[in-house]
Amino acid sequence: MKDIIEVRGLSLTIGKTAILNDVTVSLEAGKIHGLIGRNGSGKTMLMKCICGFIRPTRGVVVVDGKRVGKDVDFPKNMGIIIETPGFIPYYSGYKNLKLLAGLRNKIGKEEIIQAMERTGLDPKLKRHVKKYSLGMRQRLGLAQAIMEDPDILILDEPMNGLDKDGVEDMRRYLID
C-alpha cells in the first residue's frame, strides 16, 4: 500500500523553544499508527502540523499526495478528535453536529444520525452538551470526526474521559 501521510524534515519552533526537530515519518494507508512519547514531547503539535492547524518552521507534510499548506490548507479526507473537543454548550449534540455539517454542504441528517449511533449517542437526546459527561463529549467528538466517513482519522487522546465500556466501544469502532 502507498503512504497516506508523509512528514519530511519537519521542525517547529515557537519563540525560542524547539518543539519538533527534523521529524521524518511515513504512514502507510490502511493501517493503525500511534505516536508514543512523554508529556510535552510534541505529539499533539506534530498532529496539528499534519492537520494543517499549525505551519511548521521547516519541512513538508504530504497527505494523500497533497502538500499541506501549499496544495491544500486542511486535508478534506481527514477526521480529527482533539484532546478536549469544543462544542456550543447550549446546543444538543445533534444540533452541534448539524451546525458543523452545514459548513460542509455534503453531510446530511442521515450521516449525522449514523455517526452518533455508531459512537453510542442518542441523536434524539435534547440535553445540552454542557451537561454531557467528559466521555459523552469524547463520543460526540468521534461522531464529528467520522460523520464524513474520512479516509484518515487523527486521534489525540481519544480515550480521555471514557469509562471502561466507552474505551471498549471506541477500540471496537476503530478496529472495524
Language-model segments: residues:
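Conserved ABC transporter NBD signature motif
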Residues: 59-74
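Catalytic Walker B motif of ABC-type/P-loop ATPase nucleotide-binding domains
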Residues: 153-157
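Conserved structural motif at the start of ABC-family nucleotide-binding domains
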Residues: 5-7, 20
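The feature captures the beta-strand-to-loop junction immediately N-terminal to the Walker
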Residues: 36-38
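Conserved ABC ATPase "signature" region
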Residues: 98, 109-124
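Helix-to-loop junction immediately C-terminal to a conserved catalytic motif
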Residues: 51
